[in-house]
């Protein structure tokens, strides 16, 4: 059984495509506000509408999952949904920032926690889509980077803790990817910083999940950056990050109020 949040677009949709191409007979569930397009009829697929920023929606969708899930078989939970924001804190607004924390942090923790007993009984894997931004503090994307840092550390610690239960946890850490992220982050158009396509990222992610690697950084340039960033003192990393982002002049892509 496969459960993916946010498989309607971006990396989640690309991962769903790879599952479709594998000709798996496993039941596949998508949790998001809108269903993905073009899912082959051969796939045992169910879309469950869910706003992951709403705890009540998560509780309801887990109850629905328990009614629909097959009685046996290993479970793969892919916590993919998430979005970001660009600008000096608290831009673009406190409510937007709190919603980001709910979707990027609370939703993965709640989904995983509510399905934990099923995972322990069945065995399987939890894959959390974090980010290269999780390796260092990132000015002008402060809260987004912090949510991804949480996902990265939480996932690695959970993997160490859960192995004895037959559960593996994988943190997938893409760098810039050509998805709808720019629009959700408040940009009027693409920033042109997409270092990988969603398909390229998904290919590496799926290979890393199959190998149960605790941390999967996609893209060789991003792997180098992750190692470099992790070794720097955090104040240095933040100062260098601020200078680099300012030089990119991302403000020119931001939607005008």
What are the functions of these language-model segments?
Residues 8, 16:
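N-terminal Rossmann NAD(P)H-binding glycine-rich loop of SDR-like oxidoreductase domains
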Residues 131:
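Residue(s) in the substrate-gating loop at a strand-loop-helix junction
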Residues 171, 189-226:
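C-terminal helical subdomain
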Residues 42-56:
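Rossmann-fold cofactor-recognition segment
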Residues 80-85:
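Conserved NAD(P)H cofactor-binding loop of Rossmann-fold oxidoreductase domains
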Residues 88-101:
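Substrate-binding pocket helix/loop in short-chain dehydrogenase/reductase
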